């Protein structure tokens, strides 16, 4: 029996945020999120019941088509995608996209980190929230940390998450944890959309803390999905 997942939307566009911004990408937005960020720009994705399901085979076929049309990466987002078990989806995507190329399509995950990792993921963007702290496993495994900034407390939280990520990697290196990443995560601060205070705080902080980089929702500025 095929695995089904609630789908808000899937589309071929450009990655607008983080280290991979500007890349051609196929997005799969899964329904369901219990994190409940007040500033969320995809609140329509929170409920699972309002979204139709699709099989992992259907999604993978669409991913393979997007790959043949130039999509360089596949991004699983939400909602909170780790509310779902992603093992079947990731495996099926790899099977379908390997037919188009010598290498399977890289799978990227955008998550708050409140649930444990499932599925074989090539790149993890951790966007932790002050009111819903991430699992230690995500702090160890993430490739980049992106914190949305609205007020000063968010900057303190961003530093706390960065420091905790480094600490967890040092611990897991000693214990040979298979999910740890030896290298430090890329660090991004992203001003809250339409937040003048967040924008100013972000700019001034990065000017004096060069380990952090600016992430903008460039897809919104361009008016694309």
UniProtKB/Swiss-Prot annotation:
Q: Which UniProt keywords apply?
A: 4Fe-4S, Iron, Iron-sulfur, Lyase, Magnesium, Metal-binding, Queuosine biosynthesis, S-adenosyl-L-methionine
Give a yes or no for keyword 4Fe-4S in this entry. Answer: yes
Superkingdom classification of source? Bacteria
Which pathway does it take part in?
A: Purine metabolism; 7-cyano-7-deazaguanine biosynthesis
Could you say which residues bind [4Fe-4S] cluster here?
Answer: 33, 37, 40
Binding residue positions for S-adenosyl-L-methionine: 79, 127-129
Q: Which organism is it from?
A: Prochlorococcus marinus (strain SARG / CCMP1375 / SS120)
Q: Gene3D superfamilies under this entry?
A: Aldolase class I
Q: How is the cofactor bound?
A: Binds 1 [4Fe-4S] cluster. The cluster is coordinated with 3 cysteines and an exchangeable S-adenosyl-L-methionine.
Q: Explain the purpose of this protein.
A: Catalyzes the complex heterocyclic radical-mediated conversion of 6-carboxy-5,6,7,8-tetrahydropterin (CPH4) to 7-carboxy-7-deazaguanine (CDG), a step common to the biosynthetic pathways of all 7-deazapurine-containing compounds.
Which InterPro entries does the entry mention? 7-CO-7-deazaguanine_synth-like (IPR024924), Aldolase_TIM (IPR013785), rSAM (IPR007197)
Enumerate the residues binding substrate.
14-16, 29, 77
PANTHER family named among the record's database cross-references = 7-CARBOXY-7-DEAZAGUANINE SYNTHASE (PTHR42836:SF1)
Q: Which GO terms label this protein's molecular function in UniProt?
A: 4 iron, 4 sulfur cluster binding; carbon-nitrogen lyase activity; magnesium ion binding; S-adenosyl-L-methionine binding
Oligomeric form and interacting partners: Homodimer.
Full protein name: 7-carboxy-7-deazaguanine synthase
Family label: Belongs to the radical SAM superfamily. 7-carboxy-7-deazaguanine synthase family.
Q: Which cofactor does it need?
A: [4Fe-4S] cluster; S-adenosyl-L-methionine; Mg(2+)
Which Pfam family, any one of them, does this sequence belong to?
Answer: Fer4_12
Q: Which GO terms describe its biological process?
A: queuosine biosynthetic process
Residues annotated for Mg(2+) binding in this entry: 42
Tell me the ranges covered by the Radical SAM core domain, including all copies: 20-225
- Reactions it catalyzes: 6-carboxy-5,6,7,8-tetrahydropterin + H(+) = 7-carboxy-7-deazaguanine + NH4(+)
**Which HAMAP family does the protein's record reference?**
QueE (MF_00917)
